[in-house]
Amino acid sequence: PAGVVGDSDTATFPSVNTETAYGWNKKVKMKLPLFTGALGSTEIARKNWEHFAVGAAISGVTLVCGENVCGMDPDAEFKNGKIMRSPELARRVKVYQDWYQGYGTLLVQANVEDTRLGVPEYAVEKLGVEGIEIKWGQGAKDIGGEVKLPTIERALQLKRRGYIVIPDPENPYVQEAHKLGGIEEFERHSRLGMVNEESFLKEVARLRKIGAKY
């Protein structure tokens, strides 16, 4: 700390100030300069969310809720192609908010499908989320997210929600092959976000308008 002479008695690790902040006009204070990885729609993220969320909240770091959480929520409700209710996203946000202590924040990712489904609006306006991360790819891998789907019913549900599903579960030949055991599973793919400076600035302005701070 400022004004303290460093010696063997004062230079102890609990005395070190690791606080930092990021942002431009509105800054996020953090106790440690750390972000979690994005915990999205995977089963392992769903099962372990509470541990990550509580840990991030009390540690004062930034927690990232990954893409496709609403779209993959089997109990989600939609109206005119827009998310109206997602028990899974609501659960995740509440766990973090219940333990939040003023440092860090919760960022919700929004990829192409999330944006089309109105996830940013739902997260900010209905759940009180303050930060949205615009998602274009998978970090160094500029591809969309992928998951396996074990049933044709799940494949049909996600295709109707706007996802790319292969093979096409609405194709009669695919349905017949599935019945005969020739096709045992399906794949859900997220679209690759494309960006240029103009569209990026326009989307940032839109997110700020709906109430996102970060």
Regions found by a protein language model. Give the residues of each.
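Glycine-rich phosphate/ribose-binding loops and adjacent secondary-structure elements
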Residues: 165-168, 174-214
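Long alpha-helical, hydrophobic tracts
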Residues: 36, 40-47, 58-60, 204, ...
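Conserved, well-structured core domains of diverse proteins
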Residues: 1-32, 44-57, 62, 74-75, ...
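Active-site mouth loops of central-metabolism enzymes
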Residues: 34-47, 107-115, 185-199
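Active-site-proximal loop/turn and secondary-structure-junction residues that shape catalytic pockets
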Residues: 40, 69-71, 110-114, 136-140
